[in-house]
């Protein structure tokens, strides 16, 4: 696509509902350590947390941001569930969290620390966007769903898959207050790593683009 000089391609050329990147969701072996890297090396700040203290005993997530760039770093608290005998802790895992825990361990085994979800911010009807994506070949991963946080409104999201193990969540925050936690189930963080007071600020504006790597000779098939 050729864009004339000084012409803004957003949002009209990519669809009226598309706003930009909402966040990049990583699966990592050590979320706290990964968050520390982005905070101390790239000027990110911690903005939200999910873990045992917030009602997520099996998974931990740290959310870090630098201006318009937001990363979610998620990792397991315990080993993978299995078909054999399990201790009492693993036997208590609800089916949904069991599936997510197994997925994260498998992703880490195959890829190491890496991106799982490139999430897009959507304005408007997510149901229509999701249906259009699926009708044009996207895999239906999670149908549109609405989550609420008392006092902060609601957030609508859905997820599709394109190729490989990476997925794309569609997120509508139009009725979700700006001072709300990152997502339902998360807790706001406003503390800073003391080392950042000794480091120069790094000003990142936003995520410009993400590249989906393909195996040798695999690009043509994906494009088709």
Predicted features along the sequence, with ranges:
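Conserved short beta-strand elements that form part of the metal-binding/catalytic scaffold
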Residues: 2-10, 42-108, 154-188
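Vicinal oxygen chelate
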Residues: 19-29, 62, 84-132, 159-160, ...
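Short secondary-structure capping/junction motifs at helix and strand boundaries
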Residues: 126-145, 167
């Amino acid at each position: 696509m050729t864009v004339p000089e000084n012409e803004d391609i957003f949002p009209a050329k990519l669809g009226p509902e598309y706003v930009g990147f909402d966040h990049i969701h990583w699966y990592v072996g050590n979320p706290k350590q990964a968050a520390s890297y982005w905070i101390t090396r790239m000027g990110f700040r911690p903005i939200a947390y999910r873990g045992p203290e917030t009602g997520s005993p099996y998974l931990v997530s740290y959310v870090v941001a630098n201006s318009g760039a937001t990363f979610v770093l998620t990792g397991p608290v315990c080993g993978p569930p299995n078909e054999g005998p399990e201790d009492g802790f693993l036997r208590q895992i609800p089916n949904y969290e069991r599936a997510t825990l197994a997925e994260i361990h498998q992703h880490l085994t195959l890829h190491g620390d890496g991106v799982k979800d490139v999430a897009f911010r959507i304005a408007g009807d997510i149901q229509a966007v999701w249906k259009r994506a699926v009708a044009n070949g996207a895999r239906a991963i999670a149908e549109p769903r609405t989550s609420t946080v008392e006092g902060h409104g609601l957030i609508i999201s859905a997820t599709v898959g394109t190729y490989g193990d990476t997925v794309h969540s569609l997120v509508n925050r139009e009725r979700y207050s700006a001072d709300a936690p990152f997502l339902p189930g998360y807790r706001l963080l406003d503390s800073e790593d003391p080392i950042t007071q000794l480091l120069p600020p790094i000003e990142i504006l936003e995520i410009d683009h993400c590249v989906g790597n393909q195996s040798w000779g695999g690009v043509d098939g994906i494009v088709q």
